[in-house]
């Protein structure tokens, strides 16, 4: 299992379940670094004090709230840890609700909750089975990374999953995005429903649900590593054009979906062809000799002062 992100407890009425929080997902994206193109030297970001114009270490860095342009209120990590919040040390379950009552827009990253030792095993299993039988999810509050957060607990196989959630006031109203003055015929809606039926799947298994972008990136990197030109873009069956007749486009889409199933009507539905952009050929570049550059002195800014006692201004919720 991955490393522990946070340790605490689930508070479930008078029941406490000690847990470890671990990541539930993995990122397989290809990661690039930034390089100076002239000599391929690695470009790095360093932390500088704008008043002293020098690089500072992590031990010299702390948090502060900018009250005004020239006044900063320092906030210590110890002060944040001692905030009088029950959620600072535990995931406090506030309510149980049907999953359908939660807007998916507010559901974020998922984490596995792992019982902390044999003592926590029984109450952990109790909560997991109770959630499963009730067909509900738990809504909880917890404090991470300098702010109180909303979370959702649900069952996934034999584990309890914590999903980070957004507060209701953090979700924007989409009403202004809806097109105005548009009318649809019943035939158009029926054709769209037929297309949905033809493209309906029981799961996300299949070649069309693989990460082809990452696969293509690996092909480019491997080709350049061997001194070859990057592979050419594969030819597509056709390129989609502008939709001039919505009804005709819907009928054509339904026909293609039917054809992709085969004569029996039971074959898998494949994704319609997408337009692909051709990869540019680039010559293999030899790294140049790394050279060091002198740092240019920065203009000395106006000095900020730490506030001693000022009229408090209510800060916004931190990110």
Curated annotation (Swiss-Prot):
InterPro entries: Ku70/Ku80_beta-barrel_dom, Prok_Ku, SPOC-like_C_dom_sf. The gene is ku. SUPFAM superfamilies: SPOC domain-like. It comes from the Bacteria. SMART domains: Ku78. With LigD forms a non-homologous end joining (NHEJ) DNA repair enzyme, which repairs dsDNA breaks with reduced fidelity. Binds linear dsDNA with 5'- and 3'- overhangs but not closed circular dsDNA nor ssDNA. Recruits and stimulates the ligase activity of LigD. Belongs to the prokaryotic Ku family. Residues 252-319 are annotated as: Disordered. Homodimer. Interacts with LigD. Residues 305-319 have a biased composition (Basic residues). Keywords: DNA damage, DNA recombination, DNA repair, DNA-binding. This is Non-homologous end joining protein Ku. The keyword DNA-binding applies. CDD domains: KU_like. Residues 260-274 have a biased composition (Basic and acidic residues). One of its GO terms (molecular function) is double-stranded DNA binding. GO terms for biological process: DNA recombination; double-strand break repair via nonhomologous end joining. Residues 10-188 form the Ku domain.
